[in-house]
């Protein structure tokens, strides 16, 4: 065996170890999920090798007839799932979807009104990422940290004063619906587009368990397809058909060349799964988030927004500054196969993001593994035993998660976390 053949075996070994690690872990990362075996097969198909530049039936390459059929089906399923009459399924990520929307409806120097990162905004809403690439000047939504949401009266006043070109809702720490319909009148008065970054809550929207941004008055909804929505990594833009020409051109040739066709097929399969199972899945996610938040609160954790029921999404947030460093807690939990992330909270210094006061938790992946409210109490106890008591619980976590290896809310109902050797 040559050294380079051995490299192939080493990659295989590492991937197998990673797969086993995820199988054995309580994964509470709010931006991840697990796909069904049907979606995984699509992602591993020959489509991974192909190109299809341009819109369906208007390709720059030959040989795309089956790809056109796939894309047409994905678009139709997306429109049905989200009750819209336009969908672009070509963005390769949520950030790419945001960038296309910004390019389509703004000019260099225009203002974008969005949440600051410590208040839940995503980096793509900021100067350092997509907003800055598009040349937008970012201004901040007024925020009420007691309710972890935008201050409606102050927001409308600021829209009228600042006259942004884009009013953007959504974020990466996203506990409660945002005031979309409440902003419509002010946005219309200054000629602003309302956009909604649904990256985190797309699956909850699809399942009818969160706000419906387009119905509430948003002009565009962008999202990623792999968080609460259990598809392959990718992006999507949903809107009204009058925005089709602008957005299609902003996506291609604007920010996407080839749009990762294996993920496109996977998105179609995941969309069919959500049409069949999405309501039950999304409902259980929210139930689990509330149950986990309550269990942590009862163990003395400072879970945000107790008086509001903690959350209406897949996420919950904890201020652990009264315990010890959020970074240390997250690291210790990961060493015990409980995976979550440290997170900035309102009042934290955005320039010191390595030392925030909070932890962000998401329940969408463990929900898909079949855990329900009763199991959330056990998850909370694991977190407490590491964060507060500094115990070593890795073996117990692995034994616990060994009971939950099936991917639920899917047609195949197969065991997840398998290394697929072709």
Curated annotation (Swiss-Prot):
A GO biological-process term: glycine biosynthetic process from serine
Record-marked site positions (Plays an important role in substrate specificity): 226
Reactions mediated catalytically: 5,10-methylenetetrahydromethanopterin + glycine + H2O = 5,6,7,8-tetrahydromethanopterin + L-serine
Residue positions where N6-(pyridoxal phosphate)lysine is found in the record: 227
Pathway, per record: Amino-acid biosynthesis; glycine biosynthesis; glycine from L-serine: step 1/1
Localization per record: Cytoplasm
Gene3D superfamilies (alphabetical): Aspartate Aminotransferase, domain 1 (3.90.1150.10), Type I PLP-dependent aspartate aminotransferase-like (Major domain) (3.40.640.10)
GO cellular component: cytoplasm
InterPro entries with a match to the protein in the record: PyrdxlP-dep_Trfase, PyrdxlP-dep_Trfase_major, PyrdxlP-dep_Trfase_small, Ser_HO-MeTrfase, Ser_HO-MeTrfase-like, Ser_HO-MeTrfase_PLP_BS, SHMT-like_dom
Assembly information from the UniProt record: Homodimer.
Protein name per Swiss-Prot or TrEMBL: Serine hydroxymethyltransferase
Organism: Methanobrevibacter smithii (strain ATCC 35061 / DSM 861 / OCM 144 / PS)
